[in-house]
Amino acid sequence: MDDSTIVAGRLADMRIARFSHNDVPQYAFVQTDESDGKDYLVALEGHPLAGAGVKPTGERFPVDGDGIRLLSPVIPSKVYGLAKNYEAHAQFMHEAGHSDIKHAPEDMVIFSKPSTSVIGPDDPIVIPSYSNDMNFEPEVAVVMGRIAKNVTVEQAMDYVLGFTCVNDVTLRDLQGLDPMWTRAKGFDTSCPLGPWIVTRDDLDWKDAKISFTLNGEDVELASGTTANLIHGIPEQIAAISSFTTLLPGDVILTGTPNASGHLDPGDEAIVHAEGIGSLRNVVVRG
């Protein structure tokens, strides 16, 4: 990679990470070194979502190097999500006794999370003291790259920077108490994102495989693919941008594909999305 400036709108076929080196946060491109097969962070000057563009600083660090910590790949101003956007998840919620509705609703069910709910890879997910039933929900998240307002379905993907993994952590025992799900889905640490952003053209977002690992064991009933989304990603962007302005860095949680499950203190939760990577967090009691 040369030192020329890359403008945000032209970012393609890349992985974009946000990391700290000795507690100094910065952005990087993630590259795999063919000589050893390891991932390296190519540090950047500038912000990937800023109009001025970015360019390599000349520094390179191993992703797992000393003093390196991956952060949430963006700090969104807004996070929106879609509930019951897969028929399998809607049926699971009904069979588990969490919903009176057996099938997915015809209209989109959109909720929000505050920006303070966002954490990064390896950050702890904290069970609030007022909950005893916290659940994982593995998903693919959309990261916006341009200001989007009243965009059409046909235009929608032009406004996307890329995709990342997300765990839409939910307090099931509070979800039925608040119609807006504010406490159930908006508590601090309820939105782990990472490990990085894969740019739009470098992911088969129409058929991205999603899976989940709990304490080293694959949870087969939690797996699925974005091919089974009821409301597709362009439709989600068009719908949300019809009532609010989406800014660069804003995040949309596209839906969990199948079953979810309980999390206990000490659990290791890993969301995996084919073509993106793995997002790991450990659960602690607050």
Predicted regions mapped to residue ranges:
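N-terminal non-catalytic cap/leader segment that marks the start of a structured domain
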Residues: D2-A104, M108, D201-L203, S211, ...
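A generic local secondary-structure boundary/capping motif
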Residues: I6, R69-L71, H98-I101, I125-M134, ...
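Catalytic-pocket segment enriched in acidic/His residues
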Residues: E59-V63, R69-S72, H89, T170-G286
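Residue-level recognition of short, solvent-exposed, well-ordered loop/turn junctions
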Residues: I75, G120, N135-E137, L247, ...
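RNA pseudouridine synthases
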Residues: N85, M144-I147, V151-V166
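A short secondary-structure junction signal
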Residues: F92-M93, P121-P124, S129-Y130, V151-A156, ...
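Structural signature of FAD isoalloxazine-binding scaffolds in flavoprotein oxidoreductases
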Residues: H98-G120, F136, I270-E274
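A structural-propensity feature for long, helix-poor, extended segments
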Residues: T116-A141
